[in-house]
């Protein structure tokens, strides 16, 4: 497991720790601007590259591959425990984006954290996830760890179709420069295995089941792009928000211009400020 830690140059008056669970295909190295913003304000920012992402390679496969969804949650816990030993007695805040938001939502114990922020999350049908997982398991028997263009298209293709006449990755980033940077990043993975999809579907199914009794024992802030198809253009994420709000009144939601990856799009400064304001409350 590869772990990135960004700390302020000074060690006095530290405000807290911010743990990031990043999104699918990307890695922690993409969060340098986020880290600069928050370390300059007295926070330590850290996070691990999720299994098979970035520098957290796996010997089982050369593409995006997860053997067991629970391993992603265990890695998140291990990263936190390591950093807390290094920087004890500081409040910890948790941020999950996209894939990372589902890792956060399936973590059984959030009590070590003071607040959580969920970005680009949504509500998926548990029944549909089971059907698709069964179908893929049969179709790709013996090829579960091999990259598949069809699996990639299954996971991302429908999002691009929501924006006719736009570039393929417009659903992810609206800014042309940001989109080129993403496409040209050699550590961003586009090769997805059937096993990865199946394990991710287990995480989404678990998060969907948990909506009946969501694990939101701490204050939660939902953030999403108004044109984000992953969040159901606001409909899916608001469904999750309402379930959380019923269990915990200390739950908020904010929307921003843009599509899915609002932390890296052209309006990222306003998202950073909203997070900083939330942490100060």
Predicted regions and their residues:
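Alpha/beta-hydrolase active-site loop
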Residues: 65-84
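Conserved alpha/beta-hydrolase
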Residues: 28-60
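Alpha/beta-hydrolase-fold enzymes
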Residues: 104-187
